[in-house]
UniProtKB/Swiss-Prot annotation:
It comes from Solanum lycopersicum (Tomato). This is Heat shock cognate 70 kDa protein 1. Residues 621-650 are annotated as: Disordered. It comes from the Eukaryota. One of its GO terms (molecular function) is ATP hydrolysis activity. Keywords: ATP-binding, Nucleotide-binding, Stress response.
Length: 650
């Protein structure tokens, strides 16, 4: 592969259900299509007896192999097994999830006949690797650097885990950026030609599994996030689930059979529901038709748009809570919002547009000029160009001012949360505060770092990590001075340090030792595993190519001999020699489908050794090309390299 050492930096939208990749090229963003010609790729990984499939190939076989096809890794990443949302999701997933060390959820599949356990980070890293390969195929060079997006409302552990997934996939994640902020860049560049002055823009991002709302002020290339809100567990999949449950009950009512115990039937129903949901965005009614859904029973039904809306009405209304919270936090009235930008496939649902905008924003026109599926990857690609210094002046002048979505603080006496960094503070940021001891001659203090909005009690918030500052000299309470510093970097990841001013004793923690966080050693091991899987995939590809070459050569040779123009020029002995060799090769192929590469190659050499000299002799006998009409299937003349050649069709 030709190309510069490291190739350009790419932007990846790592989605719950679909992912998308873009790159800055020729002064614009190019959203890159995969090998199937699709500009978005399913975030699915399938494991079979022989291979690992990622993307479209994995999703296409999901009904045949539901328990070993993993999706929704984004709903697991950075969460604990005991999380209520994880427990709810597990009821709907066909694959198995078990608790690992530190309450970390582990996905269990059977791969090549062995039971394997994967962390959500590993599954996400496989999807990232696929997106990286899609970009490399397009660019013709290796790609090392990427900007990866996360929901704005992702907490610290979810961001860290996403960064780890990037490391496992072999990418250098230059920056983690928020999805609505990335979409705002796409909107800003799209609108730049037409607008002047300050604009307040609300990004409404409803995807397959997550929901974000961000309010930004855009002026002269400065994108300042004023507030952000959301729900990391609300999206298109939840609408699908409602429809699946609706039809499960209908099937039970009509046929007195319960399909919930059958993963394959449920998967086929879910696929049909996903398709129906999309159809209902443009028509008022659609049908579901599934042959032999369960125990030989065909299932035919219809659903109207009104019924679909009724099934999901509470969820659609739920979308408005973060919008109101976002406006409150930004201290803005909805009348001051200039543009509402819809992002994410689920915003195509007419009722979402109506509830969200027409009702709430009093019939305001929605901005639909940017592609809801691609806007996030577009913005990530622009940010990647900025960070690697590749874009033109149009993008190099952009400045992104993002915010932290949740308040950060520590626990003080009585289990109270003392906030150092309130939510919606622009990042990067650094905040210091002086604390002291609670009792006389206290030998040390325990610093417990929390994120969340419950000021009264830390136990209702999320504990990010804790550390001790010990060896404080004996002193009356409130005398020692302990400076605590919270420092958030541009990825939204937190460092906390504490220092005893009298002794100079220091201690610090990067909030990465979250209970479920992977250790450095585990990440290293996963990187090696990922390389091993990649090598196995390559090996399989070579095997398939070698097998196909032999098969193509054998069948071509058979057709060549059958062709009267050529067959008539061969002696019956030679003809029989070729036919026997070809028959023997084809029957060997049928019983050795899983042979090794060198076995296929040896067989190929053996077959060529018999056929090529005979064909070459025939051509020479015919005086070069005289009198032998060349046929498409006819092999070219020449020494041992003669014989039909086949070109791989991409």
């Amino acid at each position: 592969m030709a190309g510069k050492g490291e190739g350009p930096a790419i932007g990846i939208d790592l989605g719950t259900t679909y992912s998308c990749v873009g790159v800055w090229q020729h002064d614009r963003v190019e959203i890159i299509a995969n090998d199937q010609g699709n500009r978005t790729t399913p975030s699915y990984v399938g494991f079979t007896d022989t291979e690992r499939l990622i993307g479209d190939a994995a999703k296409n076989q999901v009904a045949l192999n539901p328990i070993n096809t993993v999706f929704d890794a984004k709903r697991l990443i950075g969460r604990r097994f005991s999380d209520a949302s994880v427990q709810e999701d597990m009821k709907l997933w066909p694959f198995k999830v078990i608790p690992g060390p530190g309450d970390k959820p582990m996905i269990v599949v059977t791969y090549k006949g062995e039971e394997k356990e994967f962390a959500a980070e590993e599954i996400s890293s496989m999807v990232l690797t696929k997106m990286k390969e899609i970009a490399e195929a397009f660019l013709g060079s290796t790609v090392k650097n990427a900007v990866v997006t996360v929901p704005a409302y992702f907490n610290d552990s979810q961001r860290q885990a996403t960064k780890d997934a990037g490391v496992i996939s072999g990418l250098n994640v230059m920056r983690i950026i928020n999805e609505p902020t990335a979409a705002a860049i796409a909107y800003g560049l799209d609108k730049k030609a037409t607008s002047a002055g300050e604009k307040n823009v609300l990004i409404f991002d409803l995807g397959g599994g997550t929901f974000d709302v961000s309010l930004l002020t855009i002026e002269e290339g400065i994108f300042e996030v004023k507030a952000t809100a959301g729900d990391t567990h609300l999206g298109g999949e939840d609408f699908d689930n409602r429809m699946v449950n609706h039809f499960v009950h209908e099937f039970k009512r009509k046929h007195k059979k319960d399909i919930t115990g059958n993963p394959r039937a449920l998967r086929r129903l879910r696929t049909a529901c996903e398709r129906a949901k999309r159809t209902l965005s443009s028509t008022a009614q659609t049908t579901i038709e599934i042959d032999s859904l369960y125990e030989g029973v065909d299932f035919y039904s219809t659903i109207t748009r009104a019924r679909f809306e009724e099934l999901n009405m509470d969820l659609f209304r739920k979308c408005m809570e973060p919008v109101e919270k976002c406006l409150r936090d930004a201290k803005m009235d909805k009348s001051t919002v200039h543009d509402v930008v819809l992002v994410g496939g689920s915003t195509r649902i007419p009722k979402v547009q109506q509830v969200a905008m027409t009702n709430f924003f009093n019939g305001k026109e929605l901005c639909k000029s940017i592609n809801p599926d691609e806007a996030v990857a577009y913005g990530a690609a622009v940010q990647a160009a900025i960070l690697s210094g590749e874009g033109n002046e149009k993008v190099q002048d952009l400045l992104l001012l993002d915010v932290t979505p949740l308040s950060l603080g520590l626990e003080t006496a009585g289990g109270v949360m003392t906030v150092l960094i309130p939510r919606n503070t622009t990042i990067p940021t650094k905040k210091e505060q002086v604390f002291s001891t609670y009792s006389d001659n206290q030998p040390g203090v325990l610093i417990q770092v929390f994120e969340g909005e419950r000021r009264a009690r830390t136990r209702d918030n999320n504990l990010l990590g804790k550390f001790e500052l010990s060896v404080i000299p004996p002193a009356p309470r409130v005398v020692p001075q302990i400076t605590v510093c919270f420092d958030i970097d541009a990825n939204g990841i937190l460092n906390v340090s504490a220092e005893d001013k009298t002794t100079g004793q220091k201690n610090k923690i990067t909030i990465t030792n979250d209970k479920g966080r992977l250790s450095k050693e585990e990440i290293e091991k996963m990187v090696q595993e990922a390389e091993k899987y990649k090598a196995e995939d390559e090996e399989l590809k070579k095997k398939v190519e070698a097998k196909n070459s032999l098969e193509n050569y054998a069948y071509n040779m058979r057709n060549t001999v059958k062709d009267e123009k050529i067959g008539s020029k061969l002696s019956s002995d030679d003809k029989k020699k070729i036919e026997d060799a070809v028959d023997q090769a084809i029957s060997w192929l049928e019983s050795n489908q899983l042979a090794e590469v060198d076995e296929f190659e040896d067989k190929m050499k053996e077959l060529e050794g018999i056929c090529n000299p005979i064909i070459a002799k025939m051509y020479q006998g015919a005086g070069g090309d005289a009198g032998v009409p060349m046929d498409d299937d006819a092999p070219p003349s020449g020494g041992s390299s003669a014989g039909p050649k086949i070109e791989e069709v991409d």
